[in-house]
Amino acid sequence: MSLKTGRADGTATVRIDYEECTACGLCVRVCKGAPLYLESGTVHVDQTRLFGCIGCGQCVAVCPKNCITVEGRDLFPDDIMKIPSKGSRATYEQLKSLMIARRSVRNFKDRAVEHELIDKIIDAASTAPMGLPPADTEIVVLHGSEKVQEFANDMIDLMHNLKWFFAPFMRLLMRPFIGKEACESFKTFILPIIEIFIKKREEGEDSLLYNAPLAMYFHTSPYADPADPFISATYAMLAGESLGLGSCMIGTPGPFIKYSKKLKRKYGIHLRNQQGIVVIFGYPAVRYSQALKRRLANVHFYQ
């Protein structure tokens, strides 16, 4: 049975050049959709096995003879490229240094982010892993302070209209269904932050998206793993850091926009798509002199 996603239904087509194939079996070892199997010294394709070809491209990438092509489920023969040489890849120390140097930036220069950098950020985000191929992650790009402010104002208006939902009486009614932790979050964070957004806007200050010159909203289809847009957003954030941009993840809009058909239509978001996350970008207006050590809540090695 083929895997259905927001962009694919059915199996991808697998072609093997048997004149070049040595039946080494590497493609079979990495094939988890299971259409490939080795029998009598020959690699066979049976799309009725398990999910059939899901278009992950693992067999193409591992084949030492370049004798396999896969087409379908948003994968094309021209998508195959050489793996970057080891010398051109970041070392652990270089990657860790980039991560340590990154801070959540909320103060930006009055300077536009160039289209070239936006393209690079999106290109980096597209390399993120996904639950099921092809990726269902989508991005709403808000380029320019005016567009970002329009989005911020729309979100604050929506939050203002839904403020009653987080009032004490509603929290009391919902507590048996959403739990103590969610109710406490409504009381100590959601309702107060909505009040702050509204008050600061009245004072001419954007405390939601911080007057950023660029914002991206990552979201995904109802078929996808809910984590997919957050992983892509993380890749985008690190790419922005490598390009000299400051960034900050803004999680507040996601749960609200999920239930607003009006805003989904306005910003080109499919009505049934899951909630996502906003990342703001821009040239930092402040320079950080120190890094901060972070800690996980817990690491437990099971014995």
Short names for language-model regions:
Residues M1-Q303:
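Acidic, surface-exposed loops and disordered segments
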